[in-house]
Amino acid sequence: MIYTDFQGEKISQLGMGTMRLPVVDGDNANIDEAAALEMFDYAYKHGINYFDTAWGYHDGNAELVTGKALSRYPRESFHLTTKFPGYDRNHFPKVKEIFAKQLEKLQTEYFDFYLFHNVCEYNIENYLNPAFGVKEYLVSERAAGRIKHLGYS
C-alpha cells in the first residue's frame, strides 16, 4: 500500500467508501453484513486505513455496518470520515442530535475527518445560517477533540 503523510498521519492513498456496499435482494437498506465485513477485513488487512461513510448511505445503515466492522480494530489504526447530511434541509436544526447519533452508530469517540456533505448553491446558506448553528457547533466539536479535521464535500 502507498501512504501519504497528512499532518503527521500516515493515510493510505486508496480508501474504502461505503456508499455501495453489497445488499440483499436489491434492497439498498438491507446490507449483506457478512459480505460487507469481509470487504472491510480484506481492505484493512491489505493496508487500507482510510474509511469513508455518510449519514444517508444505504438509508442510514452504512454507518452502522462501518461501526461494527471497524470496532474490531484498534481505533488509532485507521482514519474515519463521515458527513453531515446537508442534502436534506430538515437536518440542519438537528445537527447536535445527528452528530451524537453518528458517534454512536460508528462506535467511536471521534472522527478523523468530518465533512459538510454535498455543499452547493442549494444548501450553502443553511450551512452558514447562524440560526441553525451547524458551522459553529461542528467547530466547537473540533475544539473538543471529537473532530480532528473539518471540511466539506
Model-derived regions, located:
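Active-site mouth loops of central-metabolism enzymes
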Residues: 20-34, 83-93, 125-127
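N-terminal binding-site loop/beta-alpha segment at the start of enzyme catalytic domains
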Residues: 1-78, 137, 143
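Structural detector of well-ordered beta-strand residues that form the stable sheet scaffold
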Residues: 51, 80-81, 148-153
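Acidic-and-aromatic substrate-binding clefts and catalytic sites of carbohydrate-active enzymes
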Residues: 54-63, 87-93, 122-123
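Secondary-structure boundary/capping residues
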Residues: 75-79, 89, 111
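Glycine/proline-rich, positively charged
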Residues: 90-153
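Active-site beta-loop-alpha junctions enriched in small/polar residues
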Residues: 19-21, 54-56, 83-87, 116-119, ...
